[in-house]
């Protein structure tokens, strides 16, 4: 299965609310910042933004004072799982990033999608990739 298929079928899929809602954008990005696959709506990001995210996984709390920046958008960092998941909030939307052995699984949402729904979609794929040794 191609990485794009994972994005299209497992991240940008209808959320299990039976109303046809889905994430706004999603991507799978290597730890080095290279994009493996992304939705057409995923923002262009700067290398330093991805470096900051990777630093926060290695040094939890690194992004808390400055916020998480991706594609020029600033998210307030909220509770996550140290070294495994970073969550951010901006207005009525937000972002979830799950770290696997080789990649970052990223999902961005806006209402009516909830933070919990985004977390479920992103972390389910991230956990699967971890189980596969990826």
From Swiss-Prot:
* Miscellaneous comment in the UniProt entry for this protein: The variability of the residues taking part of IgE-binding epitopes might be responsible of the difference in cross-reactivity among olive pollen cultivars, and between distantly related pollen species, leading to a variable range of allergy reactions among atopic patients.
Give the matching SMART domains. Answer: PROF (SM00392)
Give the matching PANTHER family. Answer: PROFILIN, PROFILIN-5
Motif (Involved in PIP2 interaction) positions are: 84-100
Note whether Thylakoid occurs among the keywords.
no
| Pfam name, any one | Profilin
Q: How does it assemble?
A: Occurs in many kinds of cells as a complex with monomeric actin in a 1:1 ratio.
Recorded hits in InterPro entries, A to Z, give: PFN (IPR048278), PFN_euk (IPR005455), PFN_sf (IPR036140), Profilin_CS (IPR027310)
| Role according to the record | Binds to actin and affects the structure of the cytoskeleton. At high concentrations, profilin prevents the polymerization of actin, whereas it enhances it at low concentrations.
The keyword Phosphoprotein belongs to this UniProt entry's keyword annotation? yes
A single GO cellular-component term on record: cytoskeleton
Q: How is it modified after translation?
A: Phosphorylated by MAP kinases.
GO function term, MF aspect, one: actin monomer binding
Tell me the keywords, alphabetical order.
Answer: Actin-binding, Allergen, Cytoplasm, Cytoskeleton, Disulfide bond, Phosphoprotein
Which residues are annotated as modified residue Phosphothreonine in the UniProt record? 114
Q: Which cysteines are joined by disulfide bonds?
A: 13-118
Top-rank taxon of the source lineage equals Eukaryota
Quote the protein name from its UniProt record: Profilin-3
Q: Where in the cell is it found?
A: Cytoplasm, Cytoskeleton
Q: What is its main location?
A: cytoplasm
Record-stated family: Belongs to the profilin family.
């Amino acid at each position: 299965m191609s990485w794009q298929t994972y994005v299209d079928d497992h991240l940008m899929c209808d959320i299990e609310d039976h109303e046809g809602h889905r994430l706004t954008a999603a991507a799978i990005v290597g730890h080095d910042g290279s994009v493996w696959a992304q939705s057409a709506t995923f923002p262009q990001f700067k290398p330093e933004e991805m470096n900051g995210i990777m630093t926060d996984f290695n040094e939890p709390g690194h992004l808390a004072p400055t916020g998480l920046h991706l594609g020029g958008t600033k998210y307030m960092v909220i509770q996550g799982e140290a070294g495994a998941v970073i969550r951010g909030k901006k207005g009525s939307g937000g972002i979830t990033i799950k770290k696997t052995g080789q990649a970052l699984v990223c999902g961005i949402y806006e209402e009516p999608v909830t933070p919990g729904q985004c977390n479920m979609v992103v972390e389910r794929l991230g956990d699967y990739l971890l189980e596969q040794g990826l």
